[in-house]
């Protein structure tokens, strides 16, 4: 009987929506009142919560995007008092809450949960009305179901850790950028995916819920591809996550500029400094301090870039947007620099290329002066660590350069040589299947197993890191710094770790973001704050100018001093 009623109600709702939405969303009146924005924000929240919890969507029986596109014009033009009725009738039209051949719900231990989503609003009768509030609360925890056709499913990475999968989301590569429906669909998809599957909402500078009405208004005001892409980019930048990147976004790239200055840069003594010149005809030199680009202060340009490119903090931008900073849409780029204390302007021919700020290495290992070994994770070949460590066993000390990004996963294998016994090194919070917005914490261990046929490296070990150390490099440091003879040296790391998930977005774009929470073994924060070195060492402008690697020098000196004691 309930299914027949739901079917009848769905037909009735369709008629109502057709009557209230007889004009396309793109032709709706353009005056965006505060009430309209509030109504659309409510629609976003209700649709998103239902999308990730109702069996009709989780089992792939209805198209969640199609349902939203039908609702947008009706809700957009409705009086505030009507919105709750429209949403409640829509909710009832979805049918019974029946998960089919589902298994029982796993009980989650409260002390292992990290809850990010704020769903207190579903119990707010004043906000939703009594009927909608009571009915939407029936969606409760989700049993284990077949999610192959769901808006979100879960796979496992090579280490067996759960990873969020949004591959069932449609890209709409040929969308009409003037259609308010599809513009809002992109915004609502992004907002809800982060609300329920981004593990760090609690440490953002902005409240995620407060941002929603602001970006709805921005999306309604725009009419073209540029405004759509930049609105999406701007909201994603608010995640303050160095894993965030918006792929296949034409106007985000144009905002930075298509021509780049062929150099590498870093921060030293509070300045943005050239560390390497990559083209012979480039007039810049190592040690040049960047002051202006095309007549604009470089710090002002940095602030403009951070509107659309996500960084963990204002101070940690090199690894993420360093290659977007010195760019222009003019091929001839004017740079004002300071060289030897004298300011001058030079003209640089820009290149249509992107220059990575990451450190690289050609050889997987070297023997430095004093018989000190150097391990370059960026050049490690798969399966080669064992033979390399055998060659390095006779050295008087070891430097592991994790200013580089590891080319292969050596988190646990490397720890077996450096950490005596198995020890906890971090807590990983992964999304739960039963409770969208909740993450389950698991302790990760590393070190030498009792029966492992691995010789422990006994000499002093220095691990180098800096403002470019991110993600797997940070994970590796956390795994090995428990070693008795291991010292971490250099600068604070970026603070973006854990597996990356990808969210398809209308317009053919994809958004990457950190999908797991990574904490220290005692539960401390790592995201945004990064890892702190045991010994701080910073590069100097004079050192850069002279071509010195001051962090490497400090590492070698430290090992030599330890061997003298």
Label each region the model flagged.
Residues 46, 50-54, 72, 190, ...:
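Conserved PDZ fold ligand-binding element
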Residues 56-88, 198-243:
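Amphipathic alpha-helical substructures
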Residues 2-9:
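Bacterial N-terminal signal peptides that target proteins for export
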Residues 23-28:
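Bacterial lipoprotein signal-peptidase II cleavage site
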Residues 81-97, 101, 221-246, 306-357:
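PDZ-domain C-terminal substructure recognizer with occasional recognition of PDZ-binding tails
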Residues 35, 50-51, 59-63, 73-76, ...:
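Cleft-lining beta-strand/loop regions that shape enzyme active-site pockets
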């Amino acid at each position: 009987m309930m299914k027949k009623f739901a079917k009848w109600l769905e037909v009735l709702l369709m008629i109502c929506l057709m009557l209230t939405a007889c004009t396309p969303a793109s032709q709706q009146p353009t005056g965006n009142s505060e009430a309209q924005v509030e109504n659309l924000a409510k629609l976003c929240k209700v649709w998103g919560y239902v999308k990730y919890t109702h069996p009709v969507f989780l089992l792939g029986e209805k198209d969640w995007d199609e349902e939203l596109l039908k609702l947008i014009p009706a809700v957009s033009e409705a009086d505030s008092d009507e919105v709750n009725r429209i949403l409640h009738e829509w909710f009832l039209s979805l049918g019974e809450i029946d998960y089919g051949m589902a298994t029982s719900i796993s009980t989650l231990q409260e002390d292992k949960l990290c809850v990010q989503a704020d769903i207190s609003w579903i119990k707010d009768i004043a906000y939703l009305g009594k009927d909608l509030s009571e009915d939407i609360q029936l969606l409760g925890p989700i049993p284990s179901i077949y999610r192959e056709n769901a808006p979100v499913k879960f796979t496992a990475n090579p280490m067996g850790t759960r990873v969020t999968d949004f591959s069932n989301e449609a890209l709409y590569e040929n969308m009409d950028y003037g259609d308010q429906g599809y513009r809002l669909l992109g915004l609502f998809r992004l907002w809800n995916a982060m609300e329920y599957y981004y593990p760090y909402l609690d440490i953002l500078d902005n409240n995620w819920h407060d941002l929603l009405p602001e970006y709805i208004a921005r999306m309604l005001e725009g009419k073209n591809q540029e405004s759509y892409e930049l609105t999406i980019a701007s909201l994603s930048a608010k995640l303050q996550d160095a894993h965030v990147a918006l792929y296949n976004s034409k106007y985000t790239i144009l905002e930075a500029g298509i021509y780049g200055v062929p150099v590498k840069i870093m921060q030293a003594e509070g300045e943005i400094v050239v560390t390497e010149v990559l083209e012979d005809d480039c007039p810049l030199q190592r040690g040049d301090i960047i002051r202006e680009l095309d007549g604009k202060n470089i710090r002002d340009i940095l602030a403009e870039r951070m509107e659309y490119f996500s960084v963990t903090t204002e101070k940690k931008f090199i690894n993420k947007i360093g290659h977007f900073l010195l760019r222009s849409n003019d091929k001839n780029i004017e740079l004002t620099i300071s060289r030897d204390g004298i300011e001058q302007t030079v003209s640089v021919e820009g290149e249509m290329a992107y220059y990575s700020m990451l450190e690289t290495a050609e050889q997987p290992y070297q023997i430095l002066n004093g018989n000190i070994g150097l391990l370059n994770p960026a050049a490690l070949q798969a399966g080669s660590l064992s033979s390399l460590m055998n060659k390095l066993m006779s050295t008087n000390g070891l430097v592991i350069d994790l200013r580089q990004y590891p080319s292969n996963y050596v988190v646990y294998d490397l720890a077996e040589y450096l950490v005596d016994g198995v020890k906890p090194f971090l807590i990983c919070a992964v999304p739960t299947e039963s409770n969208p917005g909740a993450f389950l914490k698991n302790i990760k261990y590393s070190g030498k197993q009792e029966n492992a046929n691995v010789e422990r490296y006994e000499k002093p070990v220095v691990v180098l890191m800096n403002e470019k150390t991110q993600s797997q490099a940070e994970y590796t440091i956390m795994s090995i710094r428990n070693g008795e003879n291991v010292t971490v040296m250099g600068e604070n790391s970026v603070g973006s770790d854990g597996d990356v998930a990808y969210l398809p977005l209308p317009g053919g774009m994809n958004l990457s973001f950190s999908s797991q929470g990574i904490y220290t073994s005692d539960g401390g924060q790592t995201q945004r704050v990064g890892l702190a070195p045991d010994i701080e060492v910073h590069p100097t402008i004079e050192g850069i100018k002279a071509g010195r690697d001051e962090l490497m020098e400090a590492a070698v000196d430290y090992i030599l001093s330890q061997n003298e004691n």
